[in-house]
UniProtKB/Swiss-Prot annotation:
Membrane topology, from the record: Peripheral membrane protein
Organism of this sequence: Coccidioides immitis (strain RS) (Valley fever fungus)
Record-stated family: Belongs to the COQ4 family.
GO biological process, one term: ubiquinone biosynthetic process
Top EC group: lyase
Protein name: Ubiquinone biosynthesis protein COQ4, mitochondrial
Cofactor list: Zn(2+)
InterPro entries for the chain: Coq4, Coq4_euk
Binding of Zn(2+), residues: H166, D167, H170, E182
HAMAP family: Coq4
């Protein structure tokens, strides 16, 4: 009897050892030439070394050229795991609207939103504000790239949702897509979402012109910290259901403070410089 128990125990031990060896073998086989199957369409699994290298390279590249949206997107994905994107997903799961968004999986594109209809809405609505902001900045909701480097399929959708809602954040704050405006909005987003890429983007402020730096540090960074911390979790806003609402009412509900109009500020500075230059020429 004792011998039989010993044999069975050894058999169980051997099976456990085989499973452990198989798991280690799979881990060793995960390489550039032998990747696991993707978890969703477009998914590219990465090893920890690949993820780190891609994060560093993309961060440096986006710092040198803040207009490289593809690099910024890559930094966002490679630095969001393992903690930050799960925190954002959990914030959605803890909110009734957030849970509906995760269940419905809406997408924000020119096919899902009728821009001509939004342009026809009253001027005080969220939809009109969003559509006219797109027109003024010359951008489209179709420019957001698909998530590739986040392994969890649900978390990948959360990142995609954040990415596609970004222009709504621009619209309700009024910030333009010039580098100065993007950095200000990223600082606001970091305080609201804690996505590392949004915080890292603030370092791009070192490349601003002196007068732009002064504005950022004195006006827009304090605004971003104050408003980003005070506002509700924006990832839980079902923007598609807010299009006909009064934009000021929504700002108040979300506790979003609108910053000074950056385009007006830049325009006035240009006019002052032009007037000063003309005065010098006349004298």
């Amino acid at each position: 009897m004792a011998i039989a128990k010993s044999v069975r125990a050894r058999a169980v031990g051997l099976r456990s050892l085989r499973v452990l060896c198989a798991q280690r073998s799979v881990a060793r086989e995960f390489s550039v030439l032998n990747r696991p199957q993707p978890n969703y369409p477009g998914h590219i699994p990465l090893t920890p070394i690949e993820r780190g290298a891609l994060a560093i390279g993309s961060a440096v590249g986006s710092l040198l050229n803040p207009r490289r949206g593809d690099l910024i997107a890559t930094v966002g994905e490679t630095t969001a795991t393992p903690f930050f994107i799960y925190r954002l997903r959990d914030a959605m799961l803890a909110d009734p609207t957030g849970r509906r968004i995760l269940r419905d999986r809406p997408r924000i594109t020119s096919q899902t939103l009728s821009l001509p209809y939004l342009r026809s809405l009253p001027k005080n609505t969220v939809g009109y504000t969003y559509a006219t902001w797109l027109d003024r900045e010359g951008v489209s909701p179709d420019t957001r790239s698909s998530v590739q480097y986040i392994d969890d399929e649900e978390c990948a959708y959360v990142m995609q949702r954040y990415r596609e809602c970004h222009d709504f954040y621009h619209a309700v704050t009024g910030l333009p897509i010039v580098v100065e405006g993007e950095i200000a909005l990223k600082a606001f987003e970091f305080m609201n979402t804690l996505i590392p890429m949004t915080g890292l983007s603030v370092f791009a402020a070192i490349r601003l012109k002196p007068e732009e730096k002064q504005r950022f540090w004195s006006i827009h960074l304090p605004w971003a910290i104050r408003s980003g911390l005070a506002s509700k979790e924006l990832i839980n806003v079902y923007w598609e259901e807010q299009l006909e609402r009064d934009v000021n009412e929504l700002r108040e509900e979300l506790n979003i403070e609108k910053p000074p109009d950056l385009r007006d500020i830049r325009k006035k500075v240009r006019e002052q410089k032009k007037a000063a230059k003309e005065a010098v020429i006349k004298s």
